[in-house]
Amino acid sequence: MSTPTPLSYKDAGVDIDAGNALVNNIKSAVKRTHRPEVMGNLGGFGALCELPTKYKHPVLVSGTDGVGTKLRLAIDYKKHDTVGIDLVAMCVNDLIVQGAEPLFFLDYYATGKLDVDTATSVVNGIGEGCFQSGCALIGGETAEMPGMYEGEDYDLAGFCVGVVEKADIIDGTKVSAGDALIALASSGPHSNGYSLIRKVLEVSKADPQQDLNGKQLIEHLLEPTKIYVKSVLKLIEESDVHAMAHITGGGFWENIPRVLPANAKAVIDGASWQWPVVFDWLKTNGNISQHEMYRTFNCGVGMIIALPADKVDAALSLLEAAGEQAWLIGSIASREGEEEQVEIV
């Protein structure tokens, strides 16, 4: 009887050496995001972080999200360096809705076969997103799972924790009729609606590399999600923000009501901004109704902010000075009975 061939973890499809090489590659990206509250170094069993001392009654705010099927396009077109920014943006933009300053971020990268260069590119993007939002990339997990994912396909998840002063939590309770609504421009579809986007590409048989207003269509579609943290936190510090809505999955119809009292509705002037060309392309080539566009996509608006009408001019000036494209998009009105909480006129 012959002796069985000795087996290793690598024979089963898991390369520990590749994982170690990845950790070594991303050290500089992690170091760039360091905050003084972070204790210890990368690689511990748990990541430690103190609360900033400036808070008298700190409340932790947490969030988790992914990039969705935008990853399919990124993988197909070998554009891995910006999906990490998307991942961070989807989490930190949720946290600032409640007035929280992002503290730290963790990522989960799962793949069938670990390609060190691809994973390094992705995590460097995560580091860039953390740098833009001022939060520390404090840890993560890389899972090589042969048989669970096809080849070098991968999926991402992100987890973020922030902090806000208890007295300064923004929860929508101050919203009242007469408040103004300010919109912050998105950079494109951000990270939502990509299953429909891919369906439009399939049905229309469009070439993703075709020119669209001086840029390839695929470049419009893979534009990273805008991170609003620094500009919005500055606005919160200097103005009286009553509520904010991060326009993600569910678009206008689903996200705005999440931050409104039951007796309030948002009345939005649909002509107050111009849709970016990529949304017009999707609407036309997918024969998508106006209602479905607003239900699926951000249509050029990544964040909506409710604040007193007399604060609008100062808020717009501050946001534009911070690098945002911002405009007055509508107002809050009283809601009668079972009226819809979002009206686009």
Swiss-Prot record:
GO terms, molecular function: ATP binding; phosphoribosylamine-glycine ligase activity; phosphoribosylformylglycinamidine cyclo-ligase activity
Annotated Gene3D superfamilies: PurM-like C-terminal domain (3.90.650.10), PurM-like, N-terminal domain (3.30.1330.10)
Protein EC: 6.3.3.1
InterPro entries recorded: PurM-like_C_dom, PurM-like_C_sf, PurM-like_N, PurM-like_N_sf, PurM_cligase
Protein name as catalogued: Phosphoribosylformylglycinamidine cyclo-ligase
Pathway assignment: Purine metabolism; IMP biosynthesis via de novo pathway; 5-amino-1-(5-phospho-D-ribosyl)imidazole from N(2)-formyl-N(1)-(5-phospho-D-ribosyl)glycinamide: step 2/2
Localization of this protein: Cytoplasm
Major localisation: cytoplasm
Pfam families: AIRS (PF00586), AIRS_C (PF02769)
Family: Belongs to the AIR synthase family.
Catalyzed chemical reaction(s): 2-formamido-N(1)-(5-O-phospho-beta-D-ribosyl)acetamidine + ATP = 5-amino-1-(5-phospho-beta-D-ribosyl)imidazole + ADP + phosphate + H(+)
A GO CC term attached to the entry: cytosol
EC class (word): ligase
Alphabetical list of HAMAP family matching this protein: AIRS
Keywords tagged on the record: ATP-binding, Cytoplasm, Ligase, Nucleotide-binding, Purine biosynthesis
Stored PANTHER family: TRIFUNCTIONAL PURINE BIOSYNTHETIC PROTEIN ADENOSINE-3 (PTHR10520:SF12), TRIFUNCTIONAL PURINE BIOSYNTHETIC PROTEIN ADENOSINE-3-RELATED (PTHR10520)
GO biological process, one term: 'de novo' IMP biosynthetic process
Chain segments annotated as coiled-coil in the UniProt record: none
